[in-house]
């Protein structure tokens, strides 16, 4: 018998020590290769918007209504109604969104993948998804999981007597976990790394929750202290990261806790492993409990055993009634979690599964915050005294919660999209220009004759378009918000702002196009001039139709989060990033939905076009600035140049001749990474080769056009 026959089979694909094990700080270029067609079973020709048009929307909603009261033996409905758990599922799908980087949220159906499917805060939500499966199976690809999660939450509210604000579909599923979202550095669930929360209980960017594995905050108060006043700071920190204000916070918490219950029938030691850690025969279900039946009255989820209202399957104002009517004393759930019970109160809260059995009202520590925090308390009292104001505030806040990460309203699908434009949707006016081919040609001629350099033209277009974020679909060139606060005041945009008056002059003289279109067209003219100077004739694709937003349509505070701490494409950095500069370049590329080859072509092209934010010479490895050549790559890979940092910060470098020691170039880490990182160097070598000149021009034009049109959802 051979040695192979005697030994265990231990050489499966992907086994063994990985590059990440050897070099933990290796640049994550792989983040730019996520969600490719190779992982999508529907194929590149599948169009979700077209598939959704074929959906029998009324029939789907009717099926969801029936599901709400169709209690299953394997997971019985609390109070005979699944609505509360579907509200929780929808909330926790959308609730991972954070404004800091636009990542997270419910727009991609990520809740069914790790780590979210196994977060402690999502315990037993896997059961809600399984309850939905027969409906998803029936309607197939005409409704995405991502849309179904949110719609199920809406229908749950409606089936319990609440009037929702509306629903917009359009969330397209992906087929693997997002790798780009930084959920934190903790290695234990519910841990708190010092990098997440500082001594003043302030969340650091980009995190949106106070603990690893929580959607928001610890419901027992900071560090399970039971301190409802201290909890206010954590609540604000997390909800503010979702762009919610105090009124929306109160409405969401109180509205959500009008329904259902929390589950803590026994200590958490009774729970089995989460879905990703469960055995294969569990078929993706987790947290199997060995306490009693394991479900129904014996359910162990959060460890808290709280029912807030006397009508937990019906909309009411009873949450606020109980909150203000009773005094509260600290107690513990059967699982040992800190919670509150109404003092000297009658047993008026129905049991979820035993008819005729009642309990005293109970609350979470974070519920009491809504009464005893001075500012939250004022809002809560107003909602208590004006139930209609509460209902309206909750409807609007719920709509915002579940749609905040979808981008502009133009992306919404379906018959229930509200007509009202909301400021958080970054509204745009109706188009008033429709330039003809002759109009566009005239504008291009005016731009070419303006005296603006290639670097100026390219810089202004890049500054306008590169605010786009693929996570929440915000930003981009449409709207020309570069000319408005806050973007006009950003440090990185000051070169571009100096160019704007000339483009405004051209736009007004023509009167045939929006400023937004003129800005993009200016960049295209610059690229065409640079390509022609390199000996390659190109027509950069241009799609007119952009409009110009007004300042009153632009929430300054909301747009402030779109400002990049670093934009390596134009060699900009605020400094003191806390991470290697080149990681921020990859981060920016990922937000722009670029591939690694697109990143490479764009940086190399922008450098020789002279598009640095401050006009500096860092990375401008050419004596033909304004020509779209491959000089950046040729000279970067030239072994006759030796690089050395100019100081201990290792941020700026000098490239000297190997023989004469004379300074030839200067560069930043954003430049040198294309020679140091083995993957990026492989791409750089393609463009530095003798047959790479024309390829670079064509690849640059394609990537450039992609960035200019990232927010053109009207073109889909």
Swiss-Prot record:
Cofactor(s) this protein requires: heme b
GO annotations of cellular component type: cytosol
Positions with a binding annotation for heme b: 257
Chain positions of cross-link Tryptophyl-tyrosyl-methioninium (Trp-Tyr) (with M-242): 91-216
Enzyme active site: 92
GO biological process, alphabetically ordered: cellular response to hydrogen peroxide; hydrogen peroxide catabolic process
Cofactor: record remark: Binds 1 heme b (iron(II)-protoporphyrin IX) group per dimer.
Record location of the Tryptophyl-tyrosyl-methioninium (Tyr-Met) (with W-91) cross-link: 216-242
A Pfam family the protein falls into: peroxidase
Function of the protein: Bifunctional enzyme with both catalase and broad-spectrum peroxidase activity.
Subunit field text: Homodimer or homotetramer.
Family label: Belongs to the peroxidase family. Peroxidase/catalase subfamily.
Protein name: Catalase-peroxidase
The organism of origin for this protein: Ectopseudomonas mendocina (strain ymp) (Pseudomonas mendocina)
């Amino acid at each position: 018998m051979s040695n192979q026959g005697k030994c265990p089979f231990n050489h499966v694909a992907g086994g063994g020590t990985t590059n990440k094990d050897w070099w933990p700080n290796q640049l994550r270029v792989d983040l730019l290769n996520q969600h490719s067609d190779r992982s999508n079973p529907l194929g590149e020709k599948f169009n979700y918007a077209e598939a959704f048009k074929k959906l029998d929307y009324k029939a789907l909603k009717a099926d969801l209504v029936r599901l709400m009261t169709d209690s299953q033996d394997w997971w019985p409905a609390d109070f005979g109604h699944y609505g509360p758990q579907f509200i929780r599922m929808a909330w926790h799908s959308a609730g991972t969104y954070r404004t800091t980087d636009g990542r997270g949220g419910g727009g991609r159906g990520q809740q069914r993948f790790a780590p979210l499917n196994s977060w402690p805060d999502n315990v037993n939500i896997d059961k809600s998804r399984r309850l939905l499966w027969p409906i998803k199976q029936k309607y197939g690809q005409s409704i995405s999981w991502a849309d179904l999660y949110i719609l199920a939450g809406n229908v749950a509210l409606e089936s319990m007597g609440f009037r929702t604000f509306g629903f917009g579909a359009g969330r397209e599923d992906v087929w693997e976990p997002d790798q780009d979202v930084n959920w934190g550095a903790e290695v234990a669930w519910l841990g708190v790394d010092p990098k997440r929360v500082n001594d003043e209980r302030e969340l650091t960017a980009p995190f949106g929750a106070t603990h690893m594995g929580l959607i928001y905050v610890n419901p027992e108060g900071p560090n399970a202290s039971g301190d409802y006043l201290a909890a206010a700071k954590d609540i604000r920190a997390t909800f503010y990261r979702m762009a919610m204000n105090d009124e929306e916070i109160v409405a969401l918490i109180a509205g959500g806790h009008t329904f259902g219950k929390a589950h803590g029938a026994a200590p958490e030691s009774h729970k089995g492993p989460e879905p990703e850690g469960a055995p294969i025969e569990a078929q993706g279900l987790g947290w199997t409990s060995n306490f009693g039946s394991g479900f129904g009255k014996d359910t162990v989820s959060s460890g808290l055993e709280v029912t807030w209202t006397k009508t937990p399957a019906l909309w009411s104002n009873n949450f606020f009634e109980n909150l203000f009517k009773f005094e509260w004393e600290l107690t513990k759930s059967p699982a040992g979690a800190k919670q509150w019970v109404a003092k000297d109160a009658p047993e008026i809260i129905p049991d979820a599964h035993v008819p005729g059995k009642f309990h005293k009202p109970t609350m979470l520590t974070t519920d009491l915050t809504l009464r005893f925090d001075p500012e939250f308390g004022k809002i809560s009292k107003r909602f208590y005294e004006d139930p209609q104001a509460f209902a309206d505030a909750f409807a609007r806040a719920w709509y915002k919660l579940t749609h905040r990460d979808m981008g502009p309203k133009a992306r919404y699908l379906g018959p229930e999209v509200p007509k009202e434009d909301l400021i958080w949707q970054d509204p745009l006016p109706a188009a008033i220009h429709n330039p003809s081919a002759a109009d566009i040609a005239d504008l291009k001629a005016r731009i070419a004759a303006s005296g603006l350099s290639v670097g100026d033209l390219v810089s202004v277009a890049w500054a306008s378009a590169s605010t786009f974020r693929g996570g929440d679909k915000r930003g981009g060139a449409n709207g020309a918000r570069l000319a408005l606060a806050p973007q006009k005041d950003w440090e990185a945009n000051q070169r571009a702002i100096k160019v704007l008056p000339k483009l405004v002059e051209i736009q007004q003289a023509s009167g045939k196009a929006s400023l937004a279109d003129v800005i993009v067209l200016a960049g295209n003219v610059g690229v065409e001039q640079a390509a022609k100077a390199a000996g390659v004739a190109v027509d950069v694709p241009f799609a007119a139709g952009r409009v110009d937003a007004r300042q009153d349509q632009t929430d300054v505070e909301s747009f402030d989060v779109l400002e990049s701490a670093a934009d390596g494409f134009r060699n900009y950095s605020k400094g003191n990033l806390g991470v290697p500069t080149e990681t921020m370049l990859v981060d920016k590329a990922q937000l722009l939905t670029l591939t690694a080859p697109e990143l490479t072509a764009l940086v190399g092209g922008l450098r020789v076009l002279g598009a640095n934010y401050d006009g500096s010479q860092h990375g401008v490895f050419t004596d033909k600035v304004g020509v779209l050549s491959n000089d950046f790559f040729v000279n970067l890979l030239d072994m006759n140049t030796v690089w050395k940092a100019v100081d201990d910060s290792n941020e700026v470098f000098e490239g000297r001749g190997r023989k004469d020691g004379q300074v030839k170039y200067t560069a930043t880490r954003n430049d040198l990474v294309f020679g140091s990182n083995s993957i990026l160097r492989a791409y750089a070598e393609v463009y530095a080769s003798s047959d790479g000149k024309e390829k670079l021009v064509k690849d640059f034009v394609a990537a450039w056009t992609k960035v200019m049109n990232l927010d053109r959802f009207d073109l889909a």
